[in-house]
Amino acid sequence: KIQGDELPWGMQHYKKALKYWHPMMYNHPVTVRSTSVEFRDAGHILGAAIALIKYRGKKICYSGDFKLEKSRLHAGAKTIKEGVDALIIETTYSDRDHPDRKKLEKEFADEIEETVEAGGTVLCPAFAVGRSQELIRIIRAHSKDVPIYLDGMSKAVARIYAKYKKYLCEPDKYVNDLESINIVDSMIARKNATAGGGVIVSTAGMMEGGPAINYVKYLNSESKVVFTGYCMEGTNGWLLQNTGQLRIDNNLLEVDLPVEYKDFSAHAGRSDLLKFIKDANPGKIVCVHGDAERADNFAVELK
């Protein structure tokens, strides 16, 4: 709408599409004619699934986005150990592993404590689905007292996570942590959030829209910005991390604050990708969902 473009679909199209949806539970195969489909928990975000498709004696696994390692929200995916004819697998981080989670959490918590004690605010631009909710759990696991402010689309998603808490690894802890935070629902609440002495978790993760970008203008000199997810080159998040600038209202704003990145990725690292492939023992492998060069290099390596 802002760009003056019209969406090619509307609410009536969504409602029509819903008629053809078939909800499925994890680990419960559904057979249509001669094709069987089973979804397994991918350990990525709420609802993410690894698909196992069987057709006339052949098996195909589509990993989608997955993570084997346990996080604050998910128990982690299990590998496919029955052998498949073809594996379609993500390659987002096929060239490296992620840092140790426990050490990274401790480092993150220590920086929050230092910043808050100095009277500053930690702004965490975060993805609405998954990352925002996990940050709440991480922060609360290390501090019960630091104020947390949740803003943007993350608020609605947080309620959805609570509604489907049975799919989380520690559902009651998530609900308790959610009840302990401040939901930002007005401009006054946003001003209070930047007064210093807390953590703001807000969309958008790449700072392309959402309230996060506007918070930067009101942070005091003791504050800092901490990214916890990938920012595509050319986005405001990438720009801030690499140049110390932000595009706001078609102007470049110099941001004189520390800007950091913590790798709390919800994707499998290189070692887990290799483990998944080894356990699945596929006849063929198709590498997808990654930088083109990275995916090609991984495919060549697997040959």
Residue ranges and their predicted role:
Residues 108-228, 232-234, 288:
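Hard-cation-handling environments
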Residues 35-40, 160-169, 274-276:
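Short, surface-exposed amphipathic charged segments that create phosphate/polyanion-binding patches used
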Residues 1-148:
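His/Asp/Glu-rich metal-coordinating catalytic cores
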Residues 220-254:
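Redox- and metal-dependent alpha/beta enzyme cores, enriched for Fe-S-associated oxidoreductases
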Residues 99-104, 176-189, 204-208, 243-244, ...:
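A general structural motif
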Residues 277, 281-283:
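Proline-aspartate-enriched helix->loop->beta-strand connector
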